Amino acid sequence: MGTIQTLPGTRDILPEEIGYWQYVETITTEILSRAMYQEIRAPIFEQTSLFERGIGEATDVVGKEMYTFKDRGDRSVTLRPEGTAGVVRAYLQNNLYATGGVQRLWYQGPMFRYERPQAGRQRQFHQIGLELLGSGDPRADVEVIALATDILKKLGLQSLKLDLNSVGDRNDRQRYREALVNYFLPYKNELDPDSQDRLERNPLRILDSKNQRTKEINQNAPSILQYLGDQSKKHFDQVQQLLTDLNISYQLNPCLVRGLDYYTHTAFEIQSDDLGAQATVCGGGRYDGLVAELGGPDTPAVGWAIGMERLIILLKQRQTVPHCVPDIYIVSKGEQAEAQALILAQKLRFEGLTVELDLSGSAFGKQFKRADRSGAIACIVLGDEEAGTQTLQLKWLATKQQETLDQTQLVSEIGELKAQLARHKQATG
């Protein structure tokens, strides 16, 4: 019997890669905290009806891509395909709207869609997202866009472009939907099969087709910007002006509609040319009707999600993220020395140092080689002699300098040890 493998569309994130993920999470937390966004953690699975009502039954996500099953209570359950619907459900269930004003929330975690796996697209994928609930002000749209660009810039990403569109309100989209159907009907037999199906269910999604012939037909399709009402046009004009005021470059893309039915007014994507076909690294927009659709009060809202897998691909191309290396590597030999080494390691860790304890029990020579490979600044050596006298050997690995110290003194004078470690680290680059 062979070993069990991961399922298609899933992958292990190994220690050699996890530093990139932790780096992204750290930068995101810092930037969003400064803007007063608070983290929220919602369940990974929800009632299926949440996504059917929230995302829209006519979408590809609900119709083709969700992982849905019956649990032992005969409830229809779905692994979340995106984060916004669950956050809105939590916002309502926990009465976060009761205090009035604006709620600024952010989340991170795995999502699930049954898609064809490829670079940057997995069936289990990870997102960082934010939601600003309670404001219909165009400044809210621009705040979330600016935060997304801040995060990506802080991560050192280049070759980024912001695509911007407005999908208007419900009335605007209904007028536009009728215009699209009238435009596409004469081309129906030339459209790809998915677009033919969308013609009746969700014609706006035809604009997002990747099929070459359909893309050619789309070039002359009417623009939704021609069907915006006065209020929608005013909102979109203000968003564009505010982006200009912040020196955030953008380009209008009338074909940008996003894949979820809850979007209203502003829709946007941030893309990178370095990602090939899967160019979008962040996408979002306004969803003023979703809270009411899920049974809550009429509440304007706007948000976005960043695809972590695609972001990590870009980071690997652009920069090296430091991996965790120990400050101190402890080697020991002999029963008493090994017991003291364990105690010493725990004391130093408690004092804030990064310590790796060699547990191999092998000869000192092999342990010293592992200490050199670890990247540690210093090595603590404990043998029978040191164990008997409650001392240790402190060896600076770059200079090979070595000194004998009292074990208790080392811990009690931890500040001096930290200062020495810092000086040696600076001296060795």
From Swiss-Prot:
Listed GO MF terms? ATP binding; histidine-tRNA ligase activity
Whether Cytoplasm counts among this entry's keywords is yes
What GO terms in the biological process aspect are recorded for it?
Answer: histidyl-tRNA aminoacylation
Top-level taxon: Bacteria
Keyword Ribonucleoprotein annotated? no
Known catalytic reactions: tRNA(His) + L-histidine + ATP = L-histidyl-tRNA(His) + AMP + diphosphate + H(+)
Q: Which Pfam families match?
A: HGTP_anticodon (PF03129), tRNA-synt_His (PF13393)
Keywords (alphabetical) are: Aminoacyl-tRNA synthetase, ATP-binding, Cytoplasm, Ligase, Nucleotide-binding, Protein biosynthesis
Signal peptide as annotated in the record:
none
Coarsely, its chief localization is: cytoplasm
Q: Which cysteines are joined by disulfide bonds?
A: none
Localization of this protein = Cytoplasm
Q: What class of enzyme is it?
A: ligase
Q: Which GO terms describe its cellular component?
A: cytoplasm
Query: PROSITE patterns attached here?
Result: AA_TRNA_LIGASE_II
Which E.C. number(s) belong to this protein?
Answer: 6.1.1.21
Could you give the subunit structure recorded for this chain? Answer: Homodimer.
In the record, the note on similarity to other proteins reads: Belongs to the class-II aminoacyl-tRNA synthetase family.
Q: What is this protein called?
A: Histidine--tRNA ligase
| Species for this entry | Rippkaea orientalis (strain PCC 8801 / RF-1) (Cyanothece sp. (strain PCC 8801))
